[in-house]
Amino acid sequence: MVKKIPTIIVLLLSLLSYSSYSQLQTLSGKKLNSEDLDKYIKKQMDSLAMPGLSFALINNGKVVYHRSLGVTSEETKLKVNDQSIFEAASMSKTVFAYFVLRMVDKKLLDLDTPLYRYLPYADIEKDERYKLITARMVLSHTTGFPNWRYFDKRDENLYKYGELYLKVTPGTEFAYSGEGYRYLSLVIAHLNGLSIQTLDPLFQKEVAVPLHMKHAWFSGNNYISNHKITGHVNGMVSKKSWPTSFPEQDSTWFDAAGGLHTEALDFSAFLIGLMKGKGISKSLVNEMFKEQVALDKKSPHYLVNGDTGWGLGIAIRPVSFGTIYEHGGNNGDFQSGFKINRANQNGYVFFTNCDKGAAFNNKIAELLIN
């Protein structure tokens, strides 16, 4: 005869199971209740008037909390869901850095070989100093390039509008630059017999598929067209459909500096793979997290974020319980951010379809880091 388990025991087991599920950790390892996190996030979204959000929390190398919240557009009021696609903006750089290190592991290029030896760059060839630029300099923002030639303030007596130039000699100081990533992406495409329009399939093969990033692309496709949500600036729907830094750029380009399209669950898969050291050699993983350049205390990254150095595609920030590795993204109408603690493999990542991401990041960090 089979004995029945008393109802009270069943209830207790259910409560214990629910309690363990809802008990989360901050990046330092402090306990956090999932219901409290729900309320906190909702409060921040309401106070900042954020339309939509994709958010994930990682504990011990696993996603333990994932939310798709808000609306895809303030006009249509359609709900954000788990298939909604956001712009990663500059968080693209961390993913591209990993892609580059995959190529280094394959001996296609060396971090310290000048890039012109692989592919001369006509855009800057009149300044011989560009021949000093290496992949390491690109990924640590020491190329000397401006962020973007079309947007940065330039000396109009020296450079025409749209002309690429060097602000400083390569390798001498930190100068955040998307232009460097542009050049390196051209090199990676060239070394693989591809173009900037045909590079994304290689990214899928080398990074997205192995790390189980089901929805993550640098170039446009039908899935993005059907699932990408709408950006917002100052509470108004943005008219921009694709992020661009060049007049001739369109969705076919592989934009290494800011073109990744994805959401929090898939980006978490990347962060988990990175923290676990999957896909690249241990020495290159360590190189990625190693400080390549110290930041000046007057740097905006130091003053605003507390970053003291830069690795390969990632910022380094000391905190009371160790070190946080982070990156943000800002395409204006889409913003994003992630922070990870490599020591305990805890972290978080978010995407929002508005210009309030930096403010949200500060608020969520108060709960999950400070």
Residue ranges and their predicted role:
Residues 70-74, 332, 355-357:
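A short acidic/small-residue loop/turn micro-motif
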Residues 32, 36-43, 52, 90, ...:
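Extracytoplasmic/secreted proteins, especially bacterial periplasmic and envelope-associated proteins
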Residues 326-327, 335-354:
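Short, well-ordered beta-strand elements
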Residues 48-54, 75-137, 166-179, 255-258, ...:
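Short active-site loop at a secondary-structure junction
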